[in-house]
C-alpha cells in the first residue's frame, strides 16, 4: 500500500547547502517514481564537487604548514650560532602553525556542532513519519515504543556529542597549543586524559543507543511476532566501543537494509549524505594533511611542531568519528523502523 508522508518538516530542517544539492539532483520528494530518475553520474558529480570544496581549506593549510616547517628547519640549522634564540624559533613556528591550523579547527568544531544540531532536528522530523509507517503496517505497539525510546536514545547521542564532546575538544585544542608553546610545562597527561574521555563518552552513548534499540526490538518483537535476531542482538550490545556498537547495530538491522532502497529509504540516505558529507570530507582532508605535516615535521627534526600537529590531528580524527556516529544513529533507527514496518 502506498502511503503519502508529510515531508514538510524534513525539508524545513535541511541545511541550505543540502537543500540546494538535492534540488540540483531533482530530489524534491520521497516518491519512488521520482527517485528512479536519479542518475548515478549526477550523484557522483555532486559528491566530487563536495570533495573538491572540502579539500580546499586543508590543502591551503598544508601549504602553509610546509612553508613554516621548511623555514623553521632552515633556521634550526644555524642553531649553534643562534643558541639563545633556538627555542624562540620553535615557539614562533608553533604560533604560526596554530594560526594556520588551530584557528580553522576552532571554526570546524563550531561547524560540526551546527551540523549535529541540524541532524537532531532532522531526526525529530523523521520520527512521526516512521511512527506513521509502523502504525499503518499494523504494529501499534512498535509504533509507540519506536517514537518514545528511539527519540530519547537518538537525541541522547546527539546531545552528548554537541554538549560534552565538542566542548572537550575545545579544551583539548587550547591545551595542545599551550603545550606546543611551552613543552617544559608537561601538559601531555591532560591531553591523554581528554582523548580517553572523549572516546569513552562517544563509545558509551553509542553503546546505550544500540542497547535501547535492541531492547525495544526484543520487547516489541514478543508482541509483534518479530524474529529472534533482535533478542540475539540484545545479548551483545553493551560493549562501550563505537566500532563494536555500530557493528552490532548493523547485524540487527542488516536483514532490513534492503528496504532502504525504497523511496523513503533513499530519501533518508540522500538527506543525511548531503548534510554530513561536506563537513565530513573536510574533516578527513584536515586529518590527512595534518598526518602529512606531522611526517614532514619529524623528517625535518622539528619536534615541537610535530607534537602540535599530532595533537591537532587527534582533534580532527575525533570529530570525524563523531560525524560518522551521529548519522549512523539516524540511519540505524530508520532501518529498525523498516525492519518492523516493512516497505512503505
Sequence positions of predicted segments:
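Interfacial loop-to-transmembrane junctions
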Residues: 300-320
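Gly/Ser-rich, low-complexity
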Residues: 1-90, 103-114, 118-119, 123, ...
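Extended, low-complexity, charged alpha-helical tracts
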Residues: 122-126, 133, 295-299, 303, ...
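Loop-centered beta-sheet repeat module
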Residues: 150-211
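Membrane interface segments of multi-pass transport proteins and intramembrane proteases
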Residues: 80-84, 183-198, 297-306
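Helical hairpin unit composed of two closely spaced alpha helices linked by a short loop
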Residues: 262-303
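Mid-bilayer segments of alpha-helical transmembrane spans in multi-pass integral membrane proteins
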Residues: 95-104, 123-140, 160-168, 172, ...
Amino acid at each position: 500500500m502506498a502511503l503519502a508522508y508529510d515531508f514538510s518538516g524534513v525539508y524545513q530542517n535541511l541545511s541550505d547547502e543540502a537543500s540546494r544539492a538535492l534540488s540540483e539532483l531533482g530530489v524534491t520528494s520521497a516518491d519512488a517514481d521520482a527517485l528512479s530518475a536519479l542518475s548515478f553520474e549526477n550523484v557522483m558529480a555532486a559528491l566530487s564537487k563536495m570533495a573538491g570544496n572540502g579539500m580546499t581549506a586543508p590543502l591551503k593549510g598544508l601549504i602553509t604548514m610546509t612553508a613554516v616547517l621548511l623555514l623553521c628547519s632552515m633556521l634550526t640549522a644555524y642553531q649553534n650560532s643562534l643558541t639563545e634564540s633556538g627555542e624562540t624559533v620553535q615557539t614562533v613556528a608553533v604560533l604560526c602553525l596554530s594560526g594556520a591550523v588551530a584557528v580553522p579547527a576552532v571554526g570546524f568544531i563550531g561547524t560540526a556542532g551546527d551540523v549535529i544540531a541540524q541532524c537532531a532536528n532532522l531526526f525529530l522530523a523523521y520520527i512521526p513519519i516512521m511512527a506513521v509507517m509502523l502504525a499503518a503496517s499494523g504494529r501499534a505497539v512498535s509504533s509507540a515504543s519506536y517514537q518514545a525510546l528511539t527519540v530519547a536514545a537518538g537525541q541522547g547521542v546527539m546531545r552528548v556529542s554537541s554538549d560534552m564532546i565538542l566542548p572537550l575538544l575545545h579544551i583539548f585544542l587550547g591545551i595542545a597549543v599551550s603545550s606546543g608553546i611551552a613543552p617544559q610545562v608537561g601538559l601531555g597527561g591532560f591531553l591523554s586524559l581528554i582523548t580517553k574521555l572523549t572516546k569513552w563518552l562517544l563509545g558509551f552513548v553509542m553503546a546505550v543507543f544500540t542497547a535501547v534499540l535492541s531492547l525495544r526490538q526484543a520487547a516489541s518483537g514478543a508482541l509483534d511476532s518479530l524474529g529472534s535476531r533482535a533478542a540475539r542482538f540484545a545479548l551483545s550490545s553493551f560493549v562501550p566501543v563505537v566500532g563494536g556498537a555500530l557493528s552490532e547495530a548493523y547485524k540487527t538491522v542488516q536483514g532490513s537494509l534492503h528496504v532502504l532502497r525504497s523511496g523513503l529509504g533513499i530519501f533518508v540516505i540522500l538527506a543525511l549524505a548531503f548534510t554530513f558529507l561536506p563537513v565530513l570530507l573536510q574533516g578527513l582532508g584536515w586529518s590527512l594533511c595534518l598526518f602529512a605535516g606531522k611526517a614532514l615535521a619529524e623528517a625535518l627534526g622539528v619536534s615541537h611542531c610535530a607534537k602540535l600537529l599530532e595533537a591537532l590531528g587527534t582533534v580532527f580524527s575525533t570529530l570525524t568519528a563523531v560525524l560518522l556516529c551521529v548519522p549512523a544513529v539516524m540511519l540505524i533507527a530508520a532501518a529498525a523502523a523498516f525492519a518492523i514496518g516493512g516497505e512503505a
